[in-house]
Amino acid sequence: MRYSNVIDFSICMSIKSENTFLLENPKFIKNLKFFNIHSSQEPKSPTDIRNSVENSDFNVQLENKLKNSFKQDGKQKSKKKKILSVDLDQEHIFKKKNKSKVIISAPDDLTNNSEGSFKSGKQKKKEKGKHKQNVNKDIHHTKNNRLSNLDPLDDINKDKSVIIDSSLSIEELSIKLKIPPAEIITGLFLKGISVTVNQIIDIAIATQVAQKYNFTVINQNQNNQSELDQSDKLQQVSTITSINRAPIVTILGHVDHGKTTLLDAIRNTNAAGKEIGGITQSIKAYEVNWPYNSSNQKLIFIDTPGHEAFSSMRLRCAQITDIVILIIAADDGLKPQTIEAINYISSKKTPFIVAINKIDKANLNLIRVREELATYNIISTDWGGEIQFIEISALQKRNISQLLTAICSLAEFINLKADPTELVQGSILEAYLDKTKGIVVNIIVLSGTLHIGDIIVSGHSYGRVKKIINSLGNELIQAGPSSILEVLGFYSIPQTGRYFQVVNSEKEAKKMIAQIPLSGITQTTKNILNLNPKVYNHNLNTRSLNLIIKADTQGTIDAIINSFIQISQKKIKLNILTASLGVVSNTDLDLAFSTQALIIAFNINISTNILNAAEKLNLSLRKFVLIYDLVDYVTYSMLDLVDPEYDKILIGQAEVQTTFTINKGTVAGCIVKSGKLKKDALIGVYRKNKLIYEGVINSLKRMKNDVNEVVIGNECGILSKDYHFWQSEDLIKAYELHEKAKTL
């Protein structure tokens, strides 16, 4: 018996489809890796094998049939060979379990019944006709798959449906769609939406992700378009009564790159100097008039927070903006929120201007900033690109007029229109509860004219407009398109970021609200962390920190939640009991007392009565005005609940010389061999290199005197209350415990 160095195809080619494969792939034989196979036959060369296969009656007949099939389908056999040879290097040889034959298979064959499935003779005869018709279709389909950029999961999930009826996290969406979270995150990032695996996204974004993978999203209100669809609709106004409207300009960029300072320079104010902590924590909108082409051009500016916690606020503003000012600090370059803005601008194809700020600083490398932007295909006009770059100093108000003129020029080019005669549509920038005014809603009118007495609807909230106040603080009777307004009259607090519209009557408003399913309401932050057990409840024994959040605006609550989601919760789970607008009430105190929760008040005042009541109940009630401080406080509170861990540090060794007994127990008379021994130190006793006891030095004496420590070369007596079995020559190792830095 001997071993040959070629495959015995009389064994491995046991069914006809393998012969077909070899006939149509002559290069495959040459590329085979030959293994030592137990055989009694004479060795055959690759040429002999190929000739044997090609000249078989079956393959001669099959070749003729394939030629005819190719002619019917308008294909040539040579084209088929070319296509099939693409993946020769990807073919795999494997042995089928419990079988004495080698099966040759390509990845595409594993799911292709006509080319790679193994069937009985009867089944083969039944499908022989089908095989002839489908050969070219399968080959053509394979080619298209290789050339297309569609996700390979598209075909798997084709024609499937998924229920998305509420906001959910990326991880929950991944489970629903059976798509890796990293893939969803990458896809959203390319669209300018930065998210993490634990971050909550609304129905509109989740629906877009599902539809990308050919899912049919069900159980939503079919009468309402997605937020993005509505946005597109609002911008596309062209009627006989249309007029030019002012552009909505949003300033985007990294925290502390000068967004608010730029607006101060434009408005001749000092809002940046008045901001707590020097950062913007809410959306601010302003109207500015600038002389352009012999007339005053009205510009609407929106200032957005740059801190990462306020990503949802930035997204809301970017959805309604016409022109983006991408501001970049010349001394800092591109940063995470800058890149987030670039990705969003790119995905939405929003017109934009680059403002390179802080050129008043010394030793700047402006070329470096331009080169960084060029990597994102943002090239200035003086470098041969299409984007206007304006170098400014917001602090010194340099080149501000040049920037404003560039904005007016771009607005003129994109030719924005709105119809003031139609029913009002717009977007809610912010909503909050004021102690004296009641429910206050900041809006921007995108089309139509808003009047006192109009019935206004947004999501599940509606009301009758009682008061309209413009950005200058003046009361108005009506306001047209591209107006920043403060509106009073809503009966309940609407969801920020939602679109609103005016309807003809309260009856119509109630009818619209009734058509919206309760599950379709956009993200409710109350109990948001608790609604995601898949994300947070990894360990049922994990300790929890209960929180009650009270804030001034819905946007602030969203930012707080986003910040908390970024905190690791492997050891301690955040449990948000309530998150609502308004002042701290006695009801909040009662809930905190029964659940031992921390009460957090952000940007709201706390009455003296509430403070006194909280103190009597020994409750933790803290007020914050900076999100940095709030996140630090919650993080430290979580760390307090983490059990301490220690490092054992060897501080000395001693050897037992003798032992004697006293009333309190057995004393070991020792001599310190290295380092020192300390009272209350942790010790380990070793006998013949084997650990026999671990405990604590309860008493340490030298010359009958109690001491706190004994250093090298000195004799001492050691007493451990729970150990009495000392022996001469026992080795004692003394340790100090150093607490490790706690982590979450």
Swiss-Prot record:
PROSITE patterns linked: G_TR_2, IF2
Location(s), subcellular: Plastid, Chloroplast
Record's GO cellular component terms: chloroplast
Key words of the record: Chloroplast, GTP-binding, Initiation factor, Nucleotide-binding, Plastid, Protein biosynthesis
Domain tr-type G: 244-417
UniProt feature, compositional bias: Basic residues: 121-134
Stored InterPro entries: EF-G-like_DII, IF2_II, IF2_N, P-loop_NTPase, Small_GTP-bd, T_Tr_GTP-bd_dom, TF_IF2_bacterial-like, TIF_IF2
Keyword GTP-binding listed: yes
Chain residue ranges for the region called G1: 253-260
Annotated region (G3), positions in chain: 303-306
Chain positions covered by the region annotation Disordered: 113-146
Functional summary from the UniProt entry: One of the essential components for the initiation of protein synthesis. Protects formylmethionyl-tRNA from spontaneous hydrolysis and promotes its binding to the 30S ribosomal subunits. Also involved in the hydrolysis of GTP during the formation of the 70S ribosomal complex.
Molecular function via GO: GTP binding; GTPase activity; translation initiation factor activity
Gene that encodes it: infB
Stretch list, region G2: 278-282
UniProt-listed PANTHER family: TR-TYPE G DOMAIN-CONTAINING PROTEIN (PTHR43381:SF5), TRANSLATION INITIATION FACTOR IF-2-RELATED (PTHR43381)
Region described as G5: spans on this chain: 393-395
Region of interest called G4, as start-end residue ranges on this chain: 357-360
Family classification: Belongs to the TRAFAC class translation factor GTPase superfamily. Classic translation factor GTPase family. IF-2 subfamily.
Name recorded for this polypeptide: Translation initiation factor IF-2, chloroplastic
Binding site for GTP: 253-260, 303-307, 357-360
